[in-house]
Design a protein with these regions (language model features):
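Intrinsically disordered, low-complexity segments enriched in serine/proline and basic residues
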Residues: 2-3
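Short, Lys/Arg-enriched N-terminal segments with co-localized hydrophobic residues
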Residues: 12-29
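Iron-sulfur-associated redox domains of electron-transfer enzymes in respiratory
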Residues: 21-24, 32, 36-283, 287-288, ...
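C-terminal, charge/polar-rich interaction regions
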Residues: 276-336
């Protein structure tokens, strides 16, 4: 039953028969907030159809319409700290539209270690100017955990000396309108804070006094980031769960929407990796992991369980320690 439901979701767009746009007073064309939330939660991509190939593509037209009546785009300062840069790589893999359209039409990227052209002192000067000129307006995106031991790591150098991740995040976090922790390291510590955590890495929320919106994942799905940014732009703060993650994307467990749920309910568990039955016996932590991977998919192609490998719970606050050993059944994991 659930398997058939999942197949139907992939083959039929839930938005073919509803009106997405509303003409508001003043001639503005905006996506209603309720419809935006439904879009984020339910949109099923069609890999072979550019018109339905990704959530980012679907949202972009609405964001562009919004910008037509606005004077500015959403200002963003993107800071990389103790991370592997996997999240910006994941976002670069968004298939349609490509990253350049997101950067040009949705946000005003004021600073980014990866995407900016400036370097050295010019880059630092740009950062200082952006932070001061856009104070209380910009969204701070932090990718990576914050190392606390000896205030390491260094994220940039000024004429006055080195600036650590801790110093930079505290400075920029105090000026930002919103703070988004991008990836599990920034959200909860993640692999950077895994045992024995010699760098004493911490989540962004542990070093700031303001609210932090956690967009966890190792790496994040591009849709989770694009959708969160679009919500901040058009509607402000999204509804968050008890871990400060947007319920748009982290509202339900992997287990609830998994295409193999019927196998679990009937007690049919895989005996080896690569088999088609439920992966619970092979270490899957889907029952405690909140994300919409079963129908969101990755790069509009696939997701781990459909590729015959267990979910390792990369969006969880206790990842990776709470998921190891990866191929041990959930009740037997050391820290679950």
């Amino acid at each position: 039953m659930l398997l058939e439901y999942s197949r139907n979701k992939f083959n039929n767009s839930p938005f073919e028969n509803i009106r997405l746009l509303e003409i508001l007073k003043g001639g503005e064309v905006l996506l209603k907030r309720k419809e935006f939330i439904n879009l984020c939660r339910n949109y099923s991509p069609r890999p072979n159809n550019k018109e339905h190939s990704s959530l980012a593509h679907k949202i972009l037209a609405e964001v562009t319409s919004y910008h037509d009546s606005q004077t500015e785009k959403l200002p963003v300062i993107w800071l990389e700290t103790n991370c592997s840069c996997d999240n910006n790589i994941s976002i670069m893999n968004t298939t349609y539209p490509y990253l350049d359209r997101f950067l040009e039409e949705t946000i005003d990227l004021l600073y980014s270690n990866t995407f900016m052209a400036a370097q050295g002192q010019d880059a630092v000067n740009n950062l200082k100017a952006a932070a001061n000129q856009k104070a209380d307006q910009f969204t701070l995106v932090v990718e990576g955990a914050i190392p606390l031991k000896e205030e390491y790591n260094v994220v940039f150098i000024t004429s006055q000396g080195e600036v650590s991740a801790l110093e930079a995040v505290k400075w920029l976090g105090g000026l930002a309108k919103y703070v988004v922790a991008l990836g599990t390291c920034a959200s909860f510590g993640g692999p950077s804070a895994a045992r024995p955590n010699l760098s004493q890495s911490a989540a962004v929320s542990e070093v700031l006094d303001c609210e932090v919106i956690n967009v966890s994942g190792c790496p994040v799905n591009a849709d989770w980031f694009v959708g969160t940014i679009a919500h901040l732009l058009m509607y402000g703060r999204p509804e968050l769960d008890d871990r400060n993650r947007p319920t748009l994307f982290y509202g339900y467990t992997i287990h609830r929407n998994c295409q193999r749920r019927s196998y679990f309910d009937n007690g049919n568990l895989a005996e080896n990796l690569g088999e088609i039955e439920c992966m619970f016996s092979q270490g899957c932590v889907g029952p405690k992991t909140r994300a919409d991977c079963p129908y969101r998919q990755w790069i509009n192609v696939n997701w781990p369980v459909e590729a015959n490998t267990p979910c390792i719970g990369c969006t969880n606050p206790d990842f990776p320690d709470g998921s190891t050993p990866f191929f041990t059944p959930l009740p037997e994991k050391k820290n679950s």
